[in-house]
């Protein structure tokens, strides 16, 4: 929906044309459903199912999790339609963080969304927006929460806050940079995850993101998965890359102890 209240949703017939265009120009691709808030569309399951019938094999939903938490059976409905994974807005582990960033207490709602997704066997990635002085002291707690909720939580995707668009906060003198984010991870996990564990992005400029993958060996022990040159989420071929993403973010009991941390 648009900010002026007018319904600006793309008709499902137009989405079908977009699917056909993608399939004709190199598909099948991995499909990411974003917004706004995609779950505001009642026909979201039909959109996913239609894409599946056309041959697309991976669907990712970016969501605040409100409908997933409040509507009984909704997660299972999306799973049945063909959804693989949910990238869940998850800014922290206390209500105060959500009251500051989202205007309301949401921690119990987030837990309920995760429970419903896990029961539907949907993979989950936690997606925190990190803001200085708001939740940068909860980086370690977010990672611990993710580890405690495996195998359904497949990873954590940190996004330092950007000061443009609808963001009402003024740019501080100490913004969250990639080097600072890495230091926070190492310090707040007490060295469980180290700065040197992480590598730059492969498809984009390596200074724009970082990632590391681990195997959980016990309650407080992780094994860093070795990164090979040219591998990771951006592999040597597009088919390999798409398959890597599907395997990494979809729920699978085979990969119970594998988790990825990215920014």
Regions found by a protein language model. Give the residues of each.
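Active-site-proximal cofactor/substrate-binding loop regions of enzyme domains
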Residues: 42, 56-61, 65-87, 95-126
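Non-catalytic positions within long, well-ordered alpha-helices that form the structural scaffold/packing
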Residues: 23-24, 52, 79, 147-149
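Conserved C-terminal portion of the radical SAM core fold
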Residues: 26, 30-31, 60, 84-86, ...
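Flexible, glycine- and charge-enriched loops at secondary-structure boundaries
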Residues: 5-12, 100-107, 132
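Conserved alpha-helical substructure of the radical SAM core
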Residues: 1-63, 67-69, 73
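Active-site-proximal loop/turn and secondary-structure-junction residues that shape catalytic pockets
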Residues: 37-39, 65-67, 92-94, 130-132, ...
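Radical SAM enzyme core and accessory elements
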Residues: 214-263
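A short acidic, helix-capping loop that chelates divalent metal ions and anchors anionic groups
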Residues: 2-5, 94-100, 166-169
């Amino acid at each position: 929906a648009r900010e002026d209240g007018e319904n600006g949703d793309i008709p499902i017939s137009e989405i079908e044309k977009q699917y056909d265009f993608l399939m004709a120009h190199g598909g099948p691709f991995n499909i990411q459903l974003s917004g706004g808030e995609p779950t505001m569309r009642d026909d979201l399951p039909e959109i996913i199912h239609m894409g599946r019938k056309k041959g697309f094999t991976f669907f990712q939903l970016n969501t605040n999790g409100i409908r997933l938490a409040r509507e009984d059976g909704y997660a299972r409905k999306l799973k049945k339609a063909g959804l693989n994974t949910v990238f869940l807005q998850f800014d922290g582990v206390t209500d105060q963080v959500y009251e500051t960033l989202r205007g309301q207490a949401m921690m119990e709602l987030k837990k309920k969304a995760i429970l419903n997704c896990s029961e539907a066997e949907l993979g989950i990635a936690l997606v925190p927006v990190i803001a200085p002085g708001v939740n940068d002291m909860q980086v370690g707690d977010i990672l611990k929460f993710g580890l405690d909720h495996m195998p359904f939580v497949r990873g954590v995707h940190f996004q330092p806050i950007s000061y443009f668009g609808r963001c009402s906060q003024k740019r501080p003198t100490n913004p969250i940079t990639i080097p600072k984010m890495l230091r926070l991870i190492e310090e707040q996990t007490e060295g469980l995850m180290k700065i040197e564990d992480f590598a730059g992005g492969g498809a984009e400029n390596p200074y724009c993101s970082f990632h590391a993958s681990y195997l959980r060996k016990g309650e407080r022990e992780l094994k860093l998965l070795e990164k090979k040159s040219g591998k990771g989420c951006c592999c040597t071929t597009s088919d390999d890359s798409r398959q890597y993403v599907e395997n990494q973010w979809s729920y699978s009991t085979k990969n119970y102890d594998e988790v990825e941390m990215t920014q």
